[in-house]
A protein has these predicted regions:
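Short glycine-rich phosphate-binding loop at a beta-alpha junction
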Residues: 1-5
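Flexible beta->alpha loop and helix N-cap segments adjacent to enzyme active/binding sites
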Residues: 9-265
Length: 265
């Protein structure tokens, strides 16, 4: 386990992973100053409870979250500009929209602790064709065309697609995609065939897992393109109002907030 600023150096993490010097590496996803408070809290907990056994924290969805009433209050505020429906299975509906080629804003549960969007404050699309990468960079994120996106993959399929020997739940290991899988996920593969992989485990993020799993049932590809819910120069969307305003202003086709699905009028 290691952290601080070096912890977000994906290619260094990938080299350490590939070296096989360790059975497993763990990088705290809020590496840097933000993680100091988290680390001191753990040290205090260990000292005060006399905990002997090492433990690993796997849930880093520690930020703000909103209940259905709070979400609906925001929806009603913008009802002249949006249509919204309550979906019994938002993950299944979202997967179908993505498979049809739509760009989806995905705002769920508690916000991520750290700089990466890990499936609760994300913009999501299908990982193919290659032109999807260019479209999202140019029309949604307003970034340079070479900038890569992350493949979010069902954890049990990760070794089929990537040269990974462990989970990568916090999108902090750069690894290569296998040659026979590149054609299925070209929008998430960097020019050097590397990927910033996020493995998704149902026990950690059930709704995001269900979205990808439903996408897999439709397309037979267990991977979606995942990028942070923001545009260049802006912070990640933190509350429903932020998400709705971003959705209305930019080329995002649909927005899922909790179990509500939004479309522009």
């Amino acid at each position: 386990m290691y952290c601080w600023g070096c912890g977000v150096k994906l290619y260094i993490n990938g080299k350490i992973h590939d070296s096989k010097l360790f059975k497993k590496i763990f990088v705290q996803p809020a590496s840097g100053d933000a993680g100091i408070a988290y680390g001191t809290a753990i040290v205090s907990f260990i000292k005060n409870t006399k905990l002997k056994k090492n433990f690993e924290s796997r849930n880093f969805y520690l930020g703000s979250k909103f209940n259905p009433n709070e979400i609906k209050k925001s929806l009603l505020k913008y009802r002249k500009k949006i249509h919204f429906t309550f979906e019994k299975d938002i993950a299944k509906k979202a997967a179908k929209l993505i498979s049809d080629g739509n760009i989806l804003g995905w705002f769920q549960g508690a916000a991520e602790f750290g700089p990466r969007a890990l499936g609760n404050r994300s913009i999501i699309s299908k990982p193919f064709p290659f032109s999807m990468k260019n479209y999202v960079n140019k029309n949604v994120k307003f970034r340079e065309p070479f900038r890569p996106f992350a493949p979010a993959v069902l954890e049990n399929f990760a070794k089929d697609y990537f040269y990974l020997t462990q989970e990568s739940q916090h999108m902090l290991i750069a690894t290569k995609v296998k040659n026979n899988k590149k054609k299925f996920i070209p929008a998430t593969v960097h020019v050097d065939s590397s990927c910033r992989v996020q493995t998704v485990n149902r026990n950690i993020n059930a709704k995001f897992f269900d979205l990808i799993n439903n996408f897999y049932k439709i397309t037979k590809i267990p991977v979606v393109l995942n990028t942070s819910f923001n545009v260049k120069g802006q912070p990640i969307m933190n509350d429903p109002d932020d998400a709705i305003l971003c959705f209305l202003k930019y080329k995002i086709d649909y927005l899922a907030i909790g179990d509500f699905l939004l479309k522009k009028k």
